[in-house]
From Swiss-Prot:
It catalyses: K(+)(in) = K(+)(out); Na(+)(in) = Na(+)(out); Ca(2+)(in) = Ca(2+)(out). It is a multi-pass membrane protein. Residues 55-338 are extracellular. GO terms for molecular function: ATP binding; cadherin binding; copper ion binding; extracellularly ATP-gated monoatomic cation channel activity; identical protein binding; ligand-gated calcium channel activity; purinergic nucleotide receptor activity; signaling receptor binding. One of its GO terms (cellular component) is extracellular exosome. This is P2X purinoceptor 4. NCBIfam families: P2X. InterPro entries: P2X4_purnocptor, P2X_extracellular_dom_sf, P2X_purnocptor, P2X_RECEPTOR_CS. Residues 1-33, 360-388 are cytoplasmic. Functional P2RXs are organized as homomeric and heteromeric trimers. Forms heterotrimer with P2RX1. Interacts with P2RX7 (via C-terminus); this interaction is functional only in the presence of ATP. Forms heterotrimer with P2RX4; functional differences between homomeric P2RX4 and P2RX4/6 heterotrimer are minor. Interacts with AP1M2. Disulfide bonds join 116-165, 126-149, 132-159, 217-227, 261-270. The lineage of its organism: Eukaryota, Metazoa, Chordata, Craniata, Vertebrata. It comes from Homo sapiens (Human). Activated by ATP. pH-dependent and inhibited by acidic pH. The keyword Transferase does not apply.
């Protein structure tokens, strides 16, 4: 109990204050200056120069609109001679920050509601009606089974289904891509950005871009880095892939627009930087369900008034426009906070040198004696002298 009281008294009735001791030591002096220089280099070089710790920052707010141009020609036995324009291959016409360009297609023409044989596969091939379950509809089925086994061709029988007939046969994807000419289509990206904290706005069609230039330019990282018109084949090429290979089964491409701006400089120096990458994983070894595709239909009625449709399985490339960026501008508050933090860090040099001198060096006991001085209470000391 007495020990606890003594410890409590020592805690309550003692006070320590720093004492400046000048130690003439090359090792300690050099170490102290080296640590101080490292801290100064960190504060000035990293915090203020690289990270711009004197600036207030804001994240970009963005809007994007796109427009595709280009015409393709096909001549097949199924469709004959046909022209494909923007209304045919951009599906849907407008999306938020992205667009889909059809590059390949499987068409099933003149479908009507009726009964027809399924496409042969492991689950639909049959030998008798016993192999077909009436009323069943699997996840990969084109319709509802009638329970009958009917001839698909002269040598193969499959289960009959109630469906849109004839059913789609997507066993073989056309190669090369049906719209391989899409490689030369162009994409105009119009991007408006805003930094609300600084009330700063800009768009990627820069003030010096004229109508004449916009009609003739195509983006090139070296010759035309600020042209907002991109050739589709070049986008895929810049991401390290082949457009013709990607066009067969489709995929997803990212067009990245970076707006990192230093608003302490002229507004004309705040410029967009474009980069490209493929967003869907293309793993050759695990090539299950590759690419990008979806189905849609065009409905109409024949002369007799019967409903028909053309089923379209569209393969293509979806282009996602991804806008990101950060703007910074001088502000006194972050500047003072970082200066204060830097000054506080300089105290680390003294703490580190104290640890070395007082606990690691050979003369640590001598230095400790010089560093600390124990002083009794003046009033108690005076009373003791008077008693004597």
């Amino acid at each position: 109990m007495a020990g606890c009281c003594a410890a409590l008294a020592a805690f309550l009735f003692e006070y320590d204050t720093p004492r400046i001791v000048l130690i003439r030591s090359r090792k300690v002096g050099l170490m102290n200056r080296a640590v101080q220089l490292l801290i100064l280099a960190y504060v000035i070089g990293w915090v203020f120069v690289w990270e711009k710790g004197y600036q207030e920052t804001d994240s970009v707010v963005s809007s994007v609109t796109t427009k595709v141009k280009g015409v393709a020609v096909t001549n097949t036995s199924k469709l004959g001679f046909r022209i494909w324009d923007v209304a045919d291959y951009v599906i849907p016409a407008q999306e938020e920050n992205s667009l889909f360009v059809m590059t390949n297609v499987i068409l099933t023409m003149n479908q009507t509601q009726g009964l027809c044989p399924e496409i042969p596969d492991a689950t639909t091939v049959c030998k008798s009606d016993a192999s077909c379950t009436a009323g069943s509809a699997g996840t990969h089925s084109n319709g509802v089974s009638t329970g009958r086994c009917v001839a698909f061709n002269g040598s193969v029988k499959t289960c009959e289904v109630a469906a849109w007939c004839p059913v789609e046969d997507d066993t073989h994807v056309p190669q090369p891509a049906f719209l391989k000419a899409a490689e030369n289509f162009t994409l105009l990206v119009k991007n408006n950005i805003w930094y609300p904290k600084f009330n700063f706005s800009k768009r990627n069609i820069l003030p010096n871009i004229t109508t004449t230039y916009l009609k003739s330019c195509i983006y090139d990282a070296k010759t035309d880095p600020f042209c907002p018109i991109f050739r589709l084949g070049k986008i895929v090429e810049n991401a390290g892939h082949s457009f013709q290979d990607m066009a067969v089964e489709g995929g997803i491409m990212g067009i990245q627009v970076n707006w990192d701006c230093n608003l302490d400089r002229a507004a004309s120096l705040c410029l967009p930087r474009y980069s490209f990458r493929r967003l869907d994983t293309r793993d050759v070894e695990h090539n299950v369900s590759p690419g990008y595709n979806f189905r849609f239909a065009k409905y109409y009625r024949d002369l007799a008034g019967n409903e028909q449709r053309t089923l379209i399985k569209a393969y293509g490339i979806r282009f996602d426009i991804i806008v990101f960026g950060k703007a910074g501008k001088f502000d006194i508050i972050p500047t003072m906070i970082n200066i204060g933090s830097g000054l506080a860090l300089l105290g680390m040099a003294t703490v580190l040198c104290d640890i070395i001198v007082l606990y690691c060096m050979k003369k640590r006991l001598y230095y400790r004696e010089k560093k600390y001085k124990y002083v009794e209470d003046y009033e108690q000391g005076l009373a003791s002298e008077l008693d004597q």
